[in-house]
From Swiss-Prot:
The keyword Ribosomal protein applies. It comes from Synechocystis sp. (strain ATCC 27184 / PCC 6803 / Kazusa). This is Large ribosomal subunit protein uL13. Part of the 50S ribosomal subunit. The gene is rplM. PANTHER family: LARGE RIBOSOMAL SUBUNIT PROTEIN UL13M, RIBOSOMAL PROTEIN L13.
């Protein structure tokens, strides 16, 4: 009978990927990124270990949503003080902090525990087309999140 081989920290290699978010759909992109961060696309996936890769997302300011979500989708945060609830629409947040939109979408798709917090640190989001991670020699990953027939 064969034994199940669990990966060890020594034989794990974490790759770096660059994804261009220009014109991509937010939710579809976030699911793909969460899968890569978790390592579910690898044969060495183990639920309790960090087997995923690093992901750099560029052009976060040009991400798209469908329908009326641009005006209706709300992002909430709380300062911790009484009456400290702040609400902001997708449209306003995209102008002010476009990175936060992608980060919150991906964070919601990761586990809600210490492993999820560790995986989230491997996501790097930048509003513009440049990033400071050239030394890691990231591979360009093309993800097509636009369904066939959509504009």
């Amino acid at each position: 009978m064969n034994k199940t081989v669990l990966p060890t920290i020594d034989n794990l290699d974490h790759k770096w990927y660059v994804i261009d978010a220009e014109g991509q759909r937010l939710g579809r992109l976030a699911t793909e990124v969460a899968t890569i961060l978790r390592g579910k696309n690898k044969p060495t996936f183990t639920p309790h270990m960090d087997t995923g890769d690093f992901v750099i997302i560029i052009n976060a300011e040009k991400i798209e949503v469908t329908g009326r979500k641009r005006e209706q989708k709300l992002y909430r945060r709380h300062s911790g003080r009484p009456g400290g609830m702040k609400e902001e629409t997708f449209e306003k947040l995209q102008v002010r902090l476009p990175e936060r939109i992608v980060e919150s979408a991906v964070r919601g798709m990761l586990p809600k525990n210490s492993l999820g917090r560790k995986l989230f640190t491997k996501l790097k989001v930048y509003a513009g087309p440049s990033h400071p991670h050239a030394a890691q020699q990231p591979e360009t990953l093309v993800i097509n999140t636009i369904p066939a027939g959509a504009n």
